[in-house]
């Protein structure tokens, strides 16, 4: 016998050692324990029994092992039979899930006790190809689709869009409170929101009311943050991103606002950086902050040292992991609609992967790259481009169907109109780090960057091609301007010749196609790495709590690492191959270069967190952000291990949660311990530990994520 036919039809080499391992596991459950000679005898008997056959099914081997084991250890045979029955049941019911994955599935996405098959049918809409892709963990819609698709039939008002952007707040009291109302309504349907506050006049500007002067743009951030914290979204809080242009006179107060843990507790914040400011930083010159009050003509200006403001921004990121930076001119210049004079972005969504116009929204789904590796963990492992391109095309079709279904599920009429006019979708990827490990490629190496370019170009052209074919059938999106789209530098740089001809002939059905979301919850559900991120760590420590005895801590390996160790029969971390690297061992420049390679092919943006070590300096942060700008990123966030914001994930040789909280109390304004529950690094649902990755955060205990993508 030379090969074994797996249940999915794949032929794999026969491995006698795997039979020994399976038998040993069954024997370990008996009173006698493992008898290595018996395990070896059973494995050899299986090999000898099928000598004359070129290939044999996995079921035939297991049936034989069952009978052979009965001769040597009936008790072990019984355990083996029970194990097979349990695995069969799991295959029939769905994925094999950890407790955390079950919590995510049951509490976030499963509706009213539906079976796994019912869940698949509901989410796929009965599309067999999509349903199988989800089952095979090759494709996963975003959280709002998983949670809400089909529930309108039961009278539920749940949007299928993960994210929205509001119009910029106008400089008057009516607009400020209308915006709070828009936020509340959108949160009640399950959508997260982005909001730019750059049109609000700065502190000290004159107003025509009893106050005489305004408290400034920053003072209204807490109103929007409070609205976000009050409106629930099916067991989770709302999600909000607040932005301010770097040229606003209140920018220094904006950068500092999160130094007080009582301020803006329910929002992410980012600074919109323009090219002019970057040039001033590089040249070491002054930069003018400018605001003109539209209603009165009053001009407020302030000249600052550009490098001093850049340093303040870096220092706050070093200390508090916020604000993030958005390179706004690049965001505006690198997308399908960049040359359309009637189109403009108003802000970004809560995790910053989606720049959107006023009242814009986006439906999201992601392709799991790691499941497109053929013969993983072998010398002949390779990426299946044909299957990937087929999946990408199907993903575009799927998201267009979702977009149509969602028309009447948007919270606001303006959102419905914008969705119909622009037809923006967001197909992305996850499982990048897992894919590299399966291929034996080091994340950030030249080989990895080369492969990203190949996959990225394949992805954008598959998406453009399918969108053009949909336009052939149903017409281009209503705001389509052929001259502007064809003049887009993004289209000119990325569209293959045949795809460009299709666009010229039929137009595009969608004004936006690709994005890379943090995929925190859905990647955890599938058990793969999130977004474009490297794996966070090789292993982590889990705690089992006991009422009657001391709590116990035990080591759990990250999914892909455990899979590699099992396949390659590795028993110690020290023996892992060099290409298994984590956020703590990866050079930040390599991490930036990976994201830069992807950004070339992504017309929206990429949600990203660069995790850096504790010893990373403020000057290092400045260098990282400038390198990100120079490499062509649209935005980036950092998270420094041990920063004052308080990452309290317990790993080997780390301080306890109590110690971290105690330090946090001392470091930031002596805030009372009762207020620490609002710390973004402590889960607001269960008090567990939050991991920062992919431009978002996720609880390691209950799976809560403010992004829920």
Region roles according to the model:
Residues 346, 351-355, 399, 403-406, ...:
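Catalytic alpha/beta core of large soluble enzyme barrels
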